[in-house]
Design a protein with these regions (language model features):
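Helix-turn-helix
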Residues: 1-31, 35
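Alpha-helical DNA-contacting segments of helix-turn-helix folds
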Residues: 33-43, 106
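Hydrophobic alpha-helical connector segments
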Residues: 35, 49-81
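N-terminal hydrophobic signal/anchor transmembrane helix of membrane proteins
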Residues: 43-46, 69-81, 136-139, 163-181
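Secondary-structure edge/capping motif, primarily at the C-terminal ends of alpha-helices
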Residues: 48-59, 84-94, 121, 148-152
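Short secondary-structure transition hinges
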Residues: 58-68, 81-110
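An amphipathic alpha-helix signature
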Residues: 66, 70, 74, 108-115, ...
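Hydrophobic/aromatic-rich alpha-helical bundle segments in the mid-to-C-terminal region
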Residues: 100, 118-167, 178-183
Length: 183
């Protein structure tokens, strides 16, 4: 079923609710999708923050950095896959203008948090450059998630490996010759 066919009546039918009960909390299908989108983004964000706090941004080699990034990318993919309607929620957040702010706010929240941690590790780096880099790479990782979930014929392991390699190679510029590779 496509997003266009989603209706509050269909939601009521599937959820076992009456329309008045649903309308008490949600005035329309966009409000429902907004809440579902927030829940999905919050779950993904929590996973990324936990990964960062567990040392996800710190590695002693490029291979370790790629492996750590692959771990969080696979986790985010699985969170989306496990949420009922997760792929459809992602599609709606990209396609429906009134839902795009939820996705963008999530991206920027993750990017800010990541940038703060990277600036602690690379204090000589430009705040603006690090923040731009984290926004770009967060968006890239989100696009890779969408690609593998929306296109079942895509080789998920290969797409995940390659996006993680791209991100790690990009971030190695901030290491400035150090032996540590972050993000």
């Amino acid at each position: 079923m496509g997003f266009e066919r989603l209706s509050t009546n269909l939601v009521c039918q599937r959820a076992g609710l009456t329309p008045p009960a649903l309308y008490r909390y949600f005035p329309n299908k966009y409000a429902i999708l907004s809440e579902l989108g927030r829940r999905l983004m919050d779950a993904q964000d929590r996973a990324v923050f936990d990964w960062i706090e567990a040392g996800g941004l710190v590695a002693d080699s490029m291979d370790e950095a790629i492996a750590k990034n692959r771990e969080i990318q696979e986790t985010v993919n699985q969170i989306t896959r496990d949420m009922p309607g997760g792929v459809w929620i992602l599609r709606a957040m990209r396609a429906v203008p009134m839902l795009q702010d939820i996705r963008i706010a999530s991206r920027d929240k993750v990017a800010r948090h990541t940038a703060e941690r990277l600036l602690e590790q690379y204090p000589a780096s430009s705040t603006e450059e690090i923040y731009a880099a984290t926004r770009i790479t967060t968006e890239l990782m989100m696009a890779a998630t969408e690609m593998v979930l929306e296109q079942p014929d895509a080789d998920e392991a290969l797409v995940t490996q390659e996006v993680c390699r791209m991100v790690c190679l990009y971030y190695s510029q901030f290491a400035g010759g150090k032996t540590r590779y972050n993000l």
